[in-house]
């Protein structure tokens, strides 16, 4: 078996393999970037070379498996992709390939990364068991919802707007209050809106009562979608339908302004109120995700063959 760390120019070539094998009961949700090889290829090509890495396992001349990660040095976190394996591998060989990929990935990830997060479909039993054997702990589950654009796209509410610079302090205070371990950095939350992402707020003066952050995934492909990363309402402002209004704003931006035909979001499995909101505007359950987490320490990284 040959293990290689890929150069960024080689990442898009992984698309056909990932499209073929990241499916059904073997799915890694961090790796799921669309329903076509073209969507995978475009997303891989768009990754920042200094914020990701990919490892490939080969039994010449064929690819046996892929594992990678996106990472942020600012937040000291990495979001793992895979391992995604050739579905024809035996159980014993699959374990060998997973271990080899993990050993190399552990070596090439920046030493500054302290927290590693995997995210597998709940039906990926073999993958989840492997993560547990490597020392990862299972976190609370999440539901992934999807919605299709209807014949009439929602209008942008008049009381929703981009955050002013004077509102950034309140915005960040709210983000840290509600999602202290959120994956978006302060600089990402306060960056200027563009064609790829938007952050919109509802506020009274400089006090932000709620915000929504959304991005366009797989732009310019048939799998383009508006993904709602965060929908946040200040605890003492709840009950005023701010969440519904902010969600409408995100869908208006994605459907009307950016012209995509699909939306997606993730919600905690125990957040019944949010699930009810999403269902009421047409979102349907796509998958149940199981987060797996490892905080790196001197002895925290191991493989299934470690004692």
PLM regions and their residue ranges:
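Conserved acetyl-CoA-binding loop-helix of GNAT-fold acetyltransferases
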Residues: 91-107, 133, 230-233, 239-252, ...
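Conserved donor-binding loop and adjoining core beta-sheet/short helix segment
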Residues: 29-100, 212-229
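Conserved beta-strand-loop-alpha-helix junction that forms the acyl-donor binding cleft
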Residues: 85, 116-127, 264-275, 292-298
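Conserved active-site alpha-helix within GNAT-family acetyltransferase domains
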Residues: 122-140, 244, 269-287
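Glycine/small-residue-rich hydrophobic helix-like segments
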Residues: 186-253
